[in-house]
Amino acid sequence: ALVKASRLETGIITTAPEPQPVGPLLEGALAQARPQAEAKGLTLAAEPCGAAARFDRKWTAEALFNVVDNAVKYTPAGGRVTLSAVPLGQFCRVDVSDTGIGIPEEEQGRIFGRFYRGGAVRAEEGVGIGLYLVREILRRQGGYVKVASRPGQGTTFSLYLPRE
């Protein structure tokens, strides 16, 4: 992840956004996360999606998987991770919602920073670069990411992909 971040920052890696359906992106992220989710006894689901957006398939898939992987990692056994996508003005909003541990409000503004790791997640493996990569990948395509969370109730990450 560190190498990818460095390559994105220096322009070695570029994105090539193209108009395409979002549904296969969601299904791909779920398929990739399914083994870990099943091992934890989590329910993974994607709501039916007919939305389309303009994005680089490879890099956006990586960004989405980073978010889904975190949702699986920080959701206790028996929990749920749901993906959905809806057109919203100039953007398509892709939501990853979980019933996980949540993120304290005071940390929400910092979680997209390079190397940031919240207090509640330090026991988990990682270096704090995944959400930074998500933000950078989306930004380079004209998109952005937001988070809404309450500790003990779960989190929703919303990835905004340009529709044109």
Stretches found by the model and what they are:
Residues 10-15, 48, 52-55:
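Conserved micro-motifs of the catalytic ATP-binding
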Residues 11, 36-46:
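Short conserved segments within the C-terminal catalytic ATPase subdomain
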Residues 71-72:
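Short helix-loop "hinge" at the ATP-lid/N-box region of the Bergerat-fold HATPase_c
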Residues 78-90:
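Short beta-strand/loop element within the Bergerat-fold HATPase_c
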Residues 98:
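Acidic ATP/Mg2+-coordinating residue in the GHKL
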Residues 103-115, 135:
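Short conserved segment of the HATPase_c
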Residues 143-144:
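Conserved glycine-rich
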